[in-house]
Regions:
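Post-HExxH zinc-binding segment in Zn-dependent metallohydrolases
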Residues: 250, 254-295
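Active-site scaffold of zinc-dependent metalloenzymes
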Residues: 196-235, 242-249
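Positively charged n-region of N-terminal signal peptides that target proteins for export
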Residues: 1-4
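Bacterial N-terminal signal peptides
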Residues: 7-16
Length: 328
């Protein structure tokens, strides 16, 4: 999944020197009473000195102050209680900054310096997300994702059965195949996939034995997933790989790549909606919707549009065709 950071400009934080006290009669903008002697003037409004107060501490303001979203603050009150602070260094943010999917704000200068979680893209520091962990294969995992990470093969296989059950509800069938699951590191995954997979999370290896007459005697399929993957991420990845398995069983694995991979991503989308509704699933779905890859991103959006118009049954029937044509 690609990092989903948004570059935006900070809201105007205006540092203003207070106007000098004057000896004229005006109406106080705060209390509505007449001002007989001295007053503050700012932005066309007049105040008794004791009524020009800080929104945070309610004490009178003298000297310089900060105006933010129409409210006035002592500089120190704004800095300590109101100003947006960088989630990495803790300093006040001004000017241009970054906001991740989860609402964490960062100075733009940290973009190339901090380590981010390989799954949720949150930045990881000693103070942010409790430092996270690092796997031997180089992957980094924040503590939030680590709380649900799947490291035991028994748990992974149980999840695979749950995902398969969801896909069987819409017409897929996995009873015809000897199917096994393995948890491995990124280094081994890259060797298996020969670096050809998009945003590598899983890989499926297919074996088919035929007799002398060309009839299939046995099918053996091995699904490989990254060790330590967060639960929701694993659910989506299993749905993707199991849809490839179904395509293989129907002899349609080598069809149009955008339709094939887009369909697998749609299966991830559908299963996540059924099994794991929530912010983690929404993050994965949003990343797929924003993916600019012609095969995985555009393919997914085309399949999603097709299913929304024609339904799940028509989509499965189209996948089973020899040379399916997916409308653009």
């Amino acid at each position: 999944l690609k990092r989903a950071l948004i570059s935006i400009l900070a809201l105007g934080l205006i540092l203003i020197d207070s106007a000098p006290l004057r000896a004229e009669t005006r109406t106080c903008h705060a209390c509505g009473g007449a001002i007989q002697r001295t007053y503050f003037e700012t932005k066309g409004f007049y105040y008794h000195p004791e009524h020009f107060t800080c929104t945070q501490c309610l004490s009178p303001i003298s000297g310089s102050y900060t105006t933010y979203r129409g409210k006035n603050y002592h500089d120190s009150c704004f800095r300590d209680h109101v100003a947006r602070k960088c989630s990495i260094c803790g300093d006040v943010i001004g000017g241009q900054y970054l906001v991740d999917y989860w609402g964490n704000a960062y100075h733009a200068t940290h973009r190339d310096q901090a380590i981010s979680c390989d799954f949720c893209d949150r930045y990881i520091t000693a103070d942010l997300h409790d430092g996270g962990i690092r796997f031997d294969d180089g992957r980094s995992l924040c503590r939030i994702c680590h709380a649900t990470s799947v490291k035991k093969i028994g748990r992974a296989r149980a999840l695979m059965r749950e995902v398969a059950t969801q896909l069987e509800r819409i017409g897929m069938d996995f009873r015809e195949v000897d199917l096994d699951l393995h948890l491995i590191g990124l280094d081994k995954m890259q060797k298996l996939a020969r670096n050809r997979s998009h945003d590598l999370r899983g890989f499926t290896d297919y074996h088919e034995e035929k007799n002398l007459f060309g009839k299939t005697r046995r099918r053996k399929i091995d699904i490989y997933l990254l060790y330590g993957m967060p639960k929701v991420e694993m659910i989506g990845t299993l749905a993707h790989e199991l849809t490839h398995v179904w395509q293989f069983l129907r002899g349609r694995l080598q069809g149009d790549a955008a339709f094939s991979e887009g369909s697998c991503n749609f299966a991830s989308y559908w299963v996540l909606k059924q099994m794991a509704p929530g912010e983690e699933a929404n993050f994965i779905i949003e990343s797929m919707l924003r993916d600019q890859d012609r095969v995985y991103g555009e393919g997914f959006r085309r399949v999603k549009k097709y299913v929304e118009k024609n339904g799940l049954s028509d989509w499965l029937a189209l996948m089973a065709e020899k040379d399916p044509e997916l409308p653009r």
